[in-house]
């Protein structure tokens, strides 16, 4: 039977049925589309949550490492600050009691040795007075190394302990105090001496290599100005062996992503104080080791005290800034994960 032979009522019913069928099909299609779209949104949201969760875990690791390193620096800072006050007190008492210059220098030599011996975590301790600022008798003590006096008679004593309990001493020569040649960081080689003189504030020196007992040691120094009535009379330097930071970076690398993460400890000038991937890169600039991202990471580190991240080439790099001593520019712990 053709459609022309159908009654008007049947035609209306058929048309209504077709319309209803079309509406049902449309609703089903829209429902399927929405389900698919919702699934995509859920998957995207889940992926984002997983990424954010992973990033948060990495940031937490970086903050934990930064805190541990900060404590090491602060321990050295507080110890050096306390000993600086002790030296000032000793000098003040010597003036009041008219202590003989020989006895004063001998006593200071013993005091510096004892202070270092009492703290096996420190690599070295130096005390350098301004010319004639100790007893105004430098000329009587030139080349008397056993009394901490250098080639000009200046009290310029350095005690070191390459291994805990093994101590050696030397009088730092005038040539070392005047060495303004620069290293990879751009700082002068005598910045451990010149920085507190110029700023009259405690300084932390960029990582540098120094030979101690014939061994090349990567170290940094926290240096304190000794002031009397606002005038600088001496500089005290506390030396820290950075081998501990290299060991820390390697240990952290093993614990992150089954050893696939690279961990670096970076100074304010971008010098590598720890680099789990390659020990031979220590004391080099991060922007030379990581040509693509190094400069940007150094800038991110300098922005403040919050972790900063950088994505690229299927790697996530998170740098966590920290201040090694009060008032210093930030250093950073850099985690590089796949």
Please provide the spans of the model-predicted regions.
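Juxtamembrane extracytoplasmic/periplasmic/luminal helical "stalk" adjacent to the first N-terminal
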Residues: 9-13, 17-123, 202
């Amino acid at each position: 039977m053709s459609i022309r032979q159908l009654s008007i009522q049947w035609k209306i019913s058929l048309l209504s049925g077709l319309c209803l069928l079309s509406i049902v099909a449309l609703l089903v299609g829209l429902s399927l589309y929405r389900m698919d779209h919702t699934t995509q949104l859920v998957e995207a949201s889940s992926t984002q949550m997983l990424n954010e969760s992973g990033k948060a875990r990495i940031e937490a690791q970086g903050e934990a490492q930064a805190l541990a390193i900060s404590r090491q620096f602060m321990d050295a800072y507080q110890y050096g600050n306390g000993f600086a006050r002790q030296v000032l007190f000793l000098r003040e008492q010597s003036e009041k009691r008219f202590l003989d210059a020989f006895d004063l220098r001998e006593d200071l030599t013993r005091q510096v040795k004892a202070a270092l011996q009492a703290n096996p975590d420190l690599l070295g301790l130096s005390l350098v007075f301004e010319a004639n600022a100790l007893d105004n008798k430098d000329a009587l003590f030139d080349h008397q190394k056993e009394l901490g006096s250098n080639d000009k008679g200046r009290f310029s004593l350095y005690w070191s302990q390459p291994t805990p309990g093994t101590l050696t001493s030397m009088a730092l020569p005038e040539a070392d105090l005047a060495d303004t040649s620069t290293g990879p960081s751009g700082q002068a080689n005598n910045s451990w001496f010149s920085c507190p003189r110029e700023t009259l504030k405690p300084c932390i020196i960029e990582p540098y290599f120094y030979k101690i007992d014939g061994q090349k040691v990567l170290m940094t120094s926290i240096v304190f100005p000794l002031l009397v009535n606002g005038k600088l009379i001496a500089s005290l330097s506390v030396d820290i062996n950075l081998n501990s930071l290299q060991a820390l970076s390697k240990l952290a690398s093993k614990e992150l992503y089954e050893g696939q993460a690279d961990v670096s400890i970076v100074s304010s000038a971008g010098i590598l104080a720890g680099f789990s991937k390659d020990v031979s890169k220590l004391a080099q600039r991060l922007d030379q080791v990581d040509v693509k991202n190094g400069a940007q990471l150094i800038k991110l580190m300098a922005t403040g005290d919050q972790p900063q991240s950088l994505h690229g080439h299927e790697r996530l790099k998170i740098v966590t800034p920290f201040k090694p001593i009060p008032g210093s520019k930030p250093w950073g712990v850099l985690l590089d994960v796949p």
